[in-house]
Regions:
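Binuclear metal-ion centers of metallo-dependent hydrolases, dominated by the metallo-beta-lactamase
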Residues: 67, 79-92, 176, 180-227
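Active-site-proximal loop/helix segments of hydrolase catalytic cores
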Residues: 113-180
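Active-site environment of divalent metal-dependent phosphoester hydrolases
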Residues: 29, 50-55, 75-78, 92-95, ...
Length: 227
């Protein structure tokens, strides 16, 4: 499994059998380094409806004739915008060709702004993505919560992607504890340095992970790892 980071919380996951993008905030993200026009995937996965996660999902799904996986209300919004969708909800699992997707809790909010109107986009979520026997946990935007320990106990996670930006999500201290609870030996930090209010030192965070026996990957946009 190859995982490429495109800034903020966007990850492209590739195996021989499938390609998936999660939270494709690309065209509006100064740190993405890629255009949504260049994305070729079999599915789009969304953690919640905020613009820095919904991003270019509808465009990417339409140009690839592939579905968007999202919590029910957000999936319906994407469907009304013309995309194919898979309606998910917290705790549910779906197998789609070579991809297995399970939605978990996240403690955050989820909405979409259109003009002066805010649209409810269902509950925020984390995502367990399994392809070819490898499992990635994308925590989405979340605070630290104790059931992360349960997720780690019930699922063999090969790689966890965790927000560290603070202010809008958990910060580095809480993310370090989340990594321990998830029992993942590899972690990618997400959701930092896109805006001044979420500036963090990812190298320092990964150094702290290393002291816990966890390998951290402070990827720059366009950089990849393989697991």
């Amino acid at each position: 499994m190859k995982i490429t980071y495109y800034g903020h919380s966007a990850l492209l996951v590739e195996t021989e059998q499938a390609k998936v993008i999660i939270d494709p905030f690309l065209s509006g993200n100064p740190n993405s380094g890629i255009s949504p026009d260049d994305i070729t995937v079999d599915a789009v996965l969304l953690t919640h409806g905020h613009s820095d996660h919904l991003g270019d999902a509808v465009q990417i799904a339409k140009q690839n004739d592939c579905p968007i996986f999202a919590v029910f209300e957000l999936a319906e919004y994407c469907r009304m915008k013309g995309a194919k969708v898979k309606h998910m909800n917290i705790g549910g699992k779906h197998i789609y060709d070579a991809i297995t997707v399970k939605y978990t809790q996240a403690f955050h909010s989820s909405s979409i702004q259109e003009g002066d109107v805010w649209i409810y986009a269902g509950q925020p979520a984390g995502i367990l993505l399994t392809i070819e026997g490898k499992t990635l946990f994308h925590a989405g935007d979340t605070a630290l919560f104790s059931d992360l320990r349960l997720i780690g106990e019930r699922t063999a996670i090969d790689l966890a992607a965790l927000p560290i930006g603070d202010m809008l999500t958990m910060g580095p201290d809480d993310a370090l504890l989340a990594a321990r609870w998830l029992q993942a030996d590899k972690v990618i930090p997400l959701h930092y340095n896109t805006f001044p209010d979420i500036a963090q030192d990812a190298m320092d965070f990964c150094d702290r992970l290393r002291q816990e026996g966890i390998e951290g990957f402070p990827l720059k946009a366009g950089e990849s790892i393989e697991i």
